[in-house]
Structure formats: C-alpha cells, structure tokens
C-alpha cells in the first residue's frame, strides 16, 4: 500500500469527521476502539483518470452520534437518516481525498453513496480513525489505473 494514499485518505477522513460530524479523532486506536463491532458500511464509486471505490465502515455506536451531530439534534434520528449521514460523510471524504491523490486539475465523477456490499479485491489503502469509543475503517479500492494500484 502506498503511504501517500494512506496519508491522503487519513487526512480527508479526519478533517471530514471533525468538520461535518463534530467528532475529534484520537491519535491512536485503543483496545476498546479496536474491538468495536461494525454497525454500518457505505461505499461510493468514482471515475476519472482512475476509477475505484471508497468503503467507509463505522464501529462502536458511532452511526447515531454522527447523524445527530450533523443534524444538530439531541436524539438519534431515524435509521434512514443515520445511513444518509454516513453516506454524506463517505461522499465528502472521497471528494476531499481524490484531489490530494490525483491533483486539483483532474476531474472525477463520484456516485451516490450506497449500502456497502462485500468487495473481493484487496484495498490499495486502508486506514482506521479512532472516534470516541468507536472507530471508522476506510478502505480505498482502485481499478483502471495499474500504476496507482501498485504504489
């Protein structure tokens, strides 16, 4: 895996969770965060100079917290709104990560987020972000651009 890809993915994720989800990433993943169970996954596909998919999984009770923070609500919103919020997080992370990888002149088309299905390919980059008592796992898959996938 490329260190640059992981760095750009981590940077985009931490900024998005801070700015959009009002969550402060922890510098290290502790045991509780590491053992937190996956509660939801979404993915976004992208096409441009290279194509691929970003998968975002949240673990440890983060889904209702993220949605409530984004919507400015005290109580957890409906499951549908929780998944919409996570989809928006994935979309923003992807949109912020791609220029860091490819440069600001390249144009990408990012699809609407969807509930994630299993992916049989190995990711070209994978990072974990500690958030409160849980964590987010971010996996980047790339196709149609062999040089990037081999970095």
Label each PLM-derived region with a short phrase.
Residues 1-151:
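N-terminal auxiliary interaction/assembly segments of multi-subunit proteins
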């Amino acid at each position: 895996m490329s260190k640059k890809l992981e760095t750009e993915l981590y940077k985009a994720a931490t900024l998005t969770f801070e700015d959009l989800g009002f969550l402060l990433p922890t510098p290290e993943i502790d045991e509780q965060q590491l053992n937190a169970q996956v509660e939801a996954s979404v993915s976004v596909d992208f096409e441009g100079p290279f194509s691929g998919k970003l998968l975002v999984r949240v673990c440890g009770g983060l889904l209702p917290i993220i949605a409530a923070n984004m919507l400015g609500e005290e109580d957890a919103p409906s499951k549908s709104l929780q998944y919409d919020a996570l989809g928006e997080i994935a979309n923003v992370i992807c949109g912020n990560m791609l220029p860091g990888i490819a440069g600001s002149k390249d144009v990408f088309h990012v699809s609407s987020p969807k509930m994630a299905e299993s992916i049989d390919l190995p990711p070209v980059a994978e990072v974990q972000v500690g958030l409160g008592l849980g964590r987010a796992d971010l996996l980047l898959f790339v196709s149609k651009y062999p040089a990037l996938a081999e970095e």
